[in-house]
Curated annotation (Swiss-Prot):
The keyword Lyase does not apply. Its main location: secreted. Extracellular dipeptidyl-peptidase which removes N-terminal dipeptides sequentially from polypeptides having unsubstituted N-termini. It comes from Emericella nidulans (strain FGSC A4 / ATCC 38163 / CBS 112.46 / NRRL 194 / M139). It is an enzyme of class 3 (hydrolase). It comes from the Eukaryota. Belongs to the peptidase S9C family. Its EC number is 3.4.14.-. Residues 1-18 form the signal peptide. This is Probable dipeptidyl-peptidase 5. One of its GO terms (molecular function) is serine-type endopeptidase activity.
Length: 722
């Protein structure tokens, strides 16, 4: 039986101001707050785009962890990475180099007079992901990553050799990944040392060491989403651990990744601690997030079991550097943690998706064996980063559906939970003014085979005695979820503030609700998930009196785009006034054109040639489904989307046009699976919201609603006049 769970007094009219696409895109975007060793100040970066100047600005700021007061540190856009050396000294990467075109530099600055810092080292290329520790000797040991040649030297784009031909030649896959054609360069972690000179200033001591190049075909961080969480440096400065996809198996067919351990000075060949022959046996999936304990004696990391499944459950493992023994923790815990931090030598905090939120969990290492279930430290919001501030307190950075950024102080005592909210974006940013927890609630309802969760997001001035058209949003993945978190791309509140009640379900295949729900989508893309969505729509129709399903619209991206295409040829498709597909698959046989072959082979239980019927079982392009197409349909597909190539969107548009279904095709030649450029994002929002508003009637009801005509880009239409 379904139930509506109000997170606050949403029955009262919301005081929120309407969140427009322009406000969403131009609102400040902030990084995690990183505390100094004493835990009284944190540093974070911010960036902001202006539609007046059509430029972005960036800055670094300080957050007082007692008062929540924010003060500027620097607005120098060349400052790209900052780490604390002590309570009052910062080490950072300067993105320019006066002597080396395309190079960068390491600088040291004091907190009280940041502009008076000095250059400590020259770097031969563009570097990112700085991590550093100060050893007992006073030396600074650091690591960062850059592109590399196979000979171990750093790749500098401005100094690189160019060829007269544009040809690309491949003898193996990948050919391209995400939005990039592979080349002979790769990501690599480099290590270096800074020593104090006789003038009490730090300076480079020796050349950088490439810690990845000694392993043929290794790469760290691993693209497209790898970053500094793919590696770590021990507190004593002696060791570096990094993740790399396994170089001994075909990377396009496996998710297998190893954690390599190597001396910081590169004096020994990196060793894969969980490579072939290591214990526990049979654990061969993706590895990530290596983190050293504060005493440098242990290394925690996450690993999946299945070498072909990107959404397998992650388990925490502890590697003892002395004995080389590996111990799994909380193996019966039905969650999949994605981040780890040690608070002391015997305690770990893990972050994990958890029923539509991102919560933190406390794990005492010695007690967390067997069927141990961790206790929650947070509950309800989405914690994206966390650091030990001092004593028993964490500094937690995250977001919610109504706030793009918050920083909380959270106790390591589960009974205390959140001690204090220091700052929240919706309380300090004019663009988000008035947004709050009253804008959202959630529902649980009976799905195809189990209870299903969905978020409900309300429009500006919501009054439950009135009715609002339904905006039905379908997430991608397919192993993904709608969370109580902010998005600058698919933001439910922006949809809601056009005048909709947004319902965002987490059907079969969604993550954060246990393995069984996540795994049940395998070879079942148009089965149980579709039935869950039908039941979600029916629950809304029958139970939420303030929602007008007769004027409903639906939209989805990636797998959500596939589902919208599937809905177009299904009974549910006739219940919507308009549909939007963003980068969705349409033709079953086209799945072989993707890059990560292990994904499709796992989802459909075999290769394209061995189990072709599995690939075609839920085919939106089947003739009998095409004959049912009738609902006006907007298609977005981008040229740099190599996961689902642009031909998928063009194929769907061709069919809709020939069938006479009102349709439009939106294409960005310089965007990938996502739309991230601010100006492109504005057009995306204008077209998506304008399309939905046109057919739902919102455009007639709300004079401030976005319309298709808001876009200044000309529309190509060479059809003869009707």
């Amino acid at each position: 039986m379904g139930a509506l769970r109000w997170l606050s007094l949403a029955a009262a009219a919301s005081s929120a101001l309407a969140l427009t696409p322009e406000q969403l895109i131009s609102a400040p975007r902030r990084s995690e707050a990183i505390p100094n060793p004493s835990g009284n100040i944190a540093v974070f970066s911010s960036s902001q785009y202006s539609f007046d100047t059509h430029e972005s600005s960036s800055a670094w700021n300080l957050l007082d962890l007692r008062s929540g007061k924010i003060t500027p540190l620097t607005n120098d856009s060349n400052v790209s990475e900052i780490v604390w050396l002590n309570d009052s000294t910062l080490l950072y990467i300067n993105g320019t180099n006066a002597q080396i075109p395309g190079g960068s530099e390491l600088w040291v600055s004091g907190l009280s007079n940041f502009p008076s810092g000095y250059k400590a080292a020259s770097l031969p290329a563009s570097f990112s992901g700085l991590k550093a520790v100060t050893t007992k000797s006073g030396d600074i040991k650091f690591v960062a990553y850059a592109q590399s040649y196979r000979n171990g030297t750093a790749y500098n784009e401005e100094l690189a050799e160019t060829y007269l031909s544009s040809a690309r030649i491949y003898d193996s896959i990948y050919v391209r990944h995400w939005d990039t054609y592979l080349t002979t360069t790769f990501n690599a972690v480099f290590s270096g040392t800074l020593k104090k000179t006789q003038h009490a200033r730090y300076a480079s001591a020796g050349s950088l060491k490439n810690l990845v190049a000694p392993i043929p075909n290794a790469e760290s961080p691993y693209p497209p989403f790898g970053g500094s969480s793919d590696y770590d440096i021990s507190a004593d400065g002696k060791w570096v651990a990094y993740k790399s996809k396994a170089p001994d198996v075909p990377q396009a067919n496996h998710t297998t990744a190893y954690i390599y351990l190597v001396p910081h000075d590169g004096s020994e060949t990196p060793v894969p601690i969980n490579g072939p022959g290591s214990a526990p046996e049979g654990i061969e999936g993706d590895s990530n997030n290596p983190v050293f304990s504060p005493d440098s004696k242990s290394l925690a990391y996450l690993q999946m079991k299945d070498p072909t499944y990107e959404s397998d459950r992650r388990v925490i493992y502890i590697y003892d550097l002395a004995s080389k023994k590996i111990t799994p923790l909380a193996t019966e815990w039905d969650r999949s943690p994605d981040s780890l931090k040690w608070t002391d030598k015997s305690t770990i905090v893990a972050g994990s998706e958890d029923e539509g939120s991102g919560n933190l969990f406390l794990i005492p290492v010695k007690k967390a064996t067997g069927d141990f279930i961790p206790e929650k430290l947070t509950n309800g919001k989405y914690a994206s980063a966390f650091y030990l501030a001092s004593g028993n307190t964490l500094v937690v950075t995250g977001s919610t559906l109504y706030s793009s950024w918050y920083v909380d102080l959270v106790s390591l005592n589960p009974k205390r939970g959140t001690i204090k909210n220091l700052v929240s974006a919706h309380e300090i940013d004019p663009e988000l003014s008035g947004l709050g927890p009253e804008d959202i609630s959630d529902i649980w309802f009976a799905g195809n085979w189990t209870d299903i969760h969905a978020w409900v997001i309300y429009p500006e001035g919501f009054d439950k005695s009135k009715t609002y058209p339904l905006a039905f949003l379908i997430h991608g993945g397919p192993q993904g979820a709608w969370y109580n978190s902010w998005s600058s791309r698919w933001n439910p509140k922006v949809f809601a503030d056009q005048g909709y009640v947004v319902v965002a379900p987490n059907p079969t295949g969604s993550t954060g609700y246990g393995d069984e729900l996540t795994d049940a989508i395998q070879n079942n893309w148009g089965g149980a998930p579709y039935e869950d969505l039908v039941k979600a729509w029916e629950y809304v129709r029958d139970n939420l009196d303030y929602v007008d399903t007769d004027r409903g619209v639906a939209a989805g991206a990636s797998y959500g785009g596939f589902m919208v295409n599937w809905i177009q040829g299904s009974d549910l498709g006739r219940e919507f006034k308009a549909l939007v597909t963003h980068d969705g698959t349409f033709v079953a046989d086209a799945k072989i054109s993707t890059e990560e072959l292990w994904f499709m082979e796992r989802e459909f239980n075999g290769t394209f040639w061995d189990v072709r019927d599995n690939y075609r079982r839920f085919d939106p392009s089947a003739p009998e489904r095409i004959l049912r197409f009738a609902t006006p349909h907007l298609i977005i597909h981008n040229d740099l989307d190599y996961r689902l190539p642009v031909a998928e969107g063009l194929s769907l548009f061709n069919v809709l046009q020939e069938r006479g279904v009102p349709s439009r095709f939106l294409n960005f030649p310089d965007e990938n699976h996502w739309v991230t450029s601010p100006e492109n994002s504005l057009v995306w929002h204008q077209q998506v919201l304008g399309w939905l508003n046109k057919y739902s009637g919102i455009a007639e009801d709300n004079e401030d609603a976005v319309t298709l005509e808001d876009t200044v880009v000309p529309v190509v239409n060479i059809n003869p006049p009707a």
